A protein has these predicted regions:
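Substrate-recognition element of Asp-dependent hydrolases with the DxDx(T/V) motif
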Residues: 32, 36-69, 83-94, 133
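Gly/Ser/Thr-rich beta-alpha loop segments that engage phosphate groups in nucleotides
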Residues: 13, 56, 60, 126
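Active-site neighborhood of HAD-like aspartate-dependent phosphohydrolases
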Residues: 1-45
Length: 166
């Protein structure tokens, strides 16, 4: 079985100072691509699992989200890094099993890529990210303010990667 790191997007890979509704709103943190490259080199699959309820609420369309993700992937690839797949939940009010804190997106990717969730990590900046990781059976790393349920709490993705690779 394979090991993976599941990343939330906003607040982990890119700045979330304002909503990312268009490609020009996406501002990657300077350490993101290098952090992902370290994970790639260590043999981890790297996935993004992101709640994008703005689609259901009408702030942007799935086409816009695809353009944002194309830009994100191009910027990551410039550094030689790779995101294996991006999974998103477009729901906000609709009941579903994909919107975090549900583990649906993580479990879907784990099944598709034969991932051992017990040897994998979920990294997020919100409590719902950590709860999704726990429900999926991953180790969890919270970025920013401490959350007692998380296995680790760090300042940014680069620090999280150092924990994973130690």
């Amino acid at each position: 079985m394979n090991k993976a790191v599941f990343l939330d997007r906003d607040g982990v890979i890119n700045d979330n100072y304002k909503p990312v509704n268009r490609p020009q709103d996406l501002k990657l943190y300077p350490w993101s691509a290098q952090s992902i490259l370290h994970l790639n080199t260590a043999g981890y699959y790297v996935f993004i699992v992101t709640n994008q309820g703005g689609i259901e609420m009408g702030y942007f369309k799935e086409k816009d989200l695809n353009e944002i993700h194309i830009k994100l992937l191009k910027e990551i690839e410039k550094a030689g890094a790779n995101i294996d797949e991006i999974e998103f939940c477009p729901h906000f009010r609709t009941k579903c099993n994909c919107r975090k804190p549900s583990p649906g997106m993580i479990k879907k990717l784990a099944e598709k890529y034969n991932i051992n969730l017990q040897s994998s990590f979920m990294i997020g900046d919100r409590d719902v990210d950590i709860e999704a990781g726990i429900k999926a059976g991953c180790k969890t790393i919270k970025i920013g303010k401490s959350y007692k349920k998380a296995d680790y709490t760090v300042e940014n993705l680069l620090e999280a990667v150092k924990i994973i690779l130690q």
